[in-house]
Amino acid sequence: MIEAARRLPRKVFLPYPDAKKLAEDPFPALQSWLTEIERSNRGQRFLLCLDEYERLDEVVKATNSRAPLNFIRNLLQHHQKWILLFSGSRELSELEDYWSDYLINTRALRMTYLQESEARDLISNPVENFTNIYELTAVNEIIRLTRCQPFLVQLVCYELVELLNGDIRRNQGNADTVKATAQNVEEIIPQVLEVGVQYFRELWRSLAESDRNLLRRLIQGETPTPQDKGVVRKLVRKEILTVEGDAFQVPLVQKYVEQVLEEE
């Protein structure tokens, strides 16, 4: 990372951190390193991205120390040149109460589905001058299966391209005339669930047992009861169930849950 930063067109000089101090007490060492970066790149601002930020909760519990969160709070309060971007699958309301003490100056932004027009454009024109490889029925089926969830749209499209390329190689077909069909989309669903297993598994793992029980009952054909109101509200907010609470928002997610239940 350090060498790559120095090769950027707009060069960023990242000093090497003290490996010994990092091993002994990592978070104070990281604070010192970030200060060194500021001194070495005067006049610049920095974006620090923390993906799956909720994993820090596991570190706090495993070490019985809130050092990671103290590090974040220190950075937010005392390093104005740094912008922190947290991303994850859990809302702040789902984390332990003490998190709010450390993220006072943050702002929450919900990342949701693409607009259908945006998803269609992503499918048909992912890069400039992309050859049209989809029949309209295939595009419609991708939209239906993913409900325009951006990661799933791209995952399905990637697997479709792999399928078409494999067919072209095996049958010596013409790449300019081969197009994906709705049937092709259905064919790759098992592969999509396998390749995207980390996404689906994390989604399932983030659910409480009461959430999972309701999904099991829905798969079995039952409908929510008044006692399920709180769980339904939560699963709607997490974009798993529709507002009526009796159907999945994303068919691919439903297929994964069905697969999980079959394996139980």
Region spans (language model):
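Amphipathic alpha-helical segments in well-structured domains
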Residues: 1, 65-69, 108, 139
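Mid-core helix/loop region of P-loop NTP-binding domains shared across ATPases and GTPases
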Residues: 3-50, 54-56, 67-79
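Amphipathic alpha-helical interaction segments
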Residues: 21-32, 67, 141, 155, ...
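Conserved nucleotide-binding/hydrolysis micro-motifs of P-loop NTPases
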Residues: 55, 89-94, 114-119, 160, ...
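Sensor-1/coupling segment of RecA-like P-loop NTPase cores
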Residues: 55, 59-99
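Helix-loop-helix "sensor" segment of P-loop NTPases
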Residues: 92-144, 165-168
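Winged-helix-like regulatory helical subdomains adjacent to P-loop NTPase cores
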Residues: 133-136, 144, 148-238
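Short capping/hinge segments at domain boundaries that bridge a core fold to an adjacent linker or tail
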Residues: 149, 192-193, 208, 240-264
